[in-house]
């Protein structure tokens, strides 16, 4: 769906900017390199007092961004949301099945097959995340642990950046298109080891299809960011959650749609309508109605302009089965995106991503679907990486690993100039001329500590998608 708006970019373009990074997207990629060891519980790096391969992968990526003049802020997932209970259960079952098949293939001496299945069943735990946090502290990188969804926390940092508040971010690195639904204005996907990525500007999406895409030259099938293509019907990747619709007949042409096979058109849409489309087509918080995929959802929202009208139409269609309680579940999913609980590094407490609507401010309203609101002191301990966000118990600090090799830019050895050069003390320095004394590693600091003692500000609504 988003492919027509993706543009290749070299991250050096954003030198001097601050970037939020979805930590778990990096951890998952890094874990693939040691999937066999994780699947068989052979964690040799602990015995050798070395960083785990998934930690080294993340640190190298962070060092690369630092080399290009970008300040990364690594954002971790926190506790599980009740709204994702069903999705989490399905994922656990899929992982367990993959692990079972991995052990079967290993017993059959199929090492490659076992590695593949173990990679599909990798589960990133809070303990693994804490290993990365320890390494980030050691290398002086900023980080923050979200109370719940990292995506919502990243969106909150993007709000701060848009307002010019300290600690905000200008860009986002992720592999999850949920960040577009959350309203992040600038998202980069597919970051590789050479600093090349795919850039997506939300304002471009809302301004309509690019000229070449509208003409059918690029992205005529509206492929998603993960490369999965939409077919002529509804079996396509939605904006959020990867939910798939079944192949069904069309629901009629949308007024804002350039053609049956062309990219979707959001000209004249408000961000609220865009988010309604994302939820309606299926997301982590709510599966799609059978027969309602991304294209049909777009057609319905474009025609009726509000989800209330869309739901009324669906309830009146005898060919569509709307599950019992779907209307309430839809509102909860929409509110979970819009009003997620996030950590405010300025006020050092939790707040909603956007101010609560009147119906959620009523004390009689059950807001358990947003996750429990925790005390400020607990929120700080979680955000600064000292407390497990799920068990709410202090982490055990892992032993410090031995010195390890760092990232170097393409085509350069660690002895050359212009890169990140490892010094005798284990830190990394910018060395444009290849000479000069090595600087000590930066002082470890948690992102959430940056604003301690500063006057708290009230964070407003942040980004305004309704203008124009």
Question: Model regions: which residues?
Answer:
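Acidic, metal-binding active-site segment of PIN/NYN-like and related structure-specific nucleases
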Residues: 154, 162-191, 223, 243, ...
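Noncatalytic, basic helical substrate-engagement surface that gates or grips nucleic-acid strands
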Residues: 13-149, 153-164, 218-221, 230-233, ...
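Amphipathic alpha-helical interface elements that mediate macromolecular binding in regulatory proteins
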Residues: 53-63, 130, 134, 152, ...
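Non-catalytic nucleic-acid-binding/docking modules located in mid-to-C-terminal regions
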Residues: 6-15, 209-219, 224-468
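Acidic, PIN/NYN-like endoribonuclease modules and their adjacent C-terminal/linker elements
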Residues: 184-216, 228, 259-261
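Eukaryotic beta-rich interaction modules
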Residues: 1-5, 56
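Intrinsically disordered, low-complexity regions enriched in proline, serine, glycine
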Residues: 30, 84-85, 145, 182-183, ...
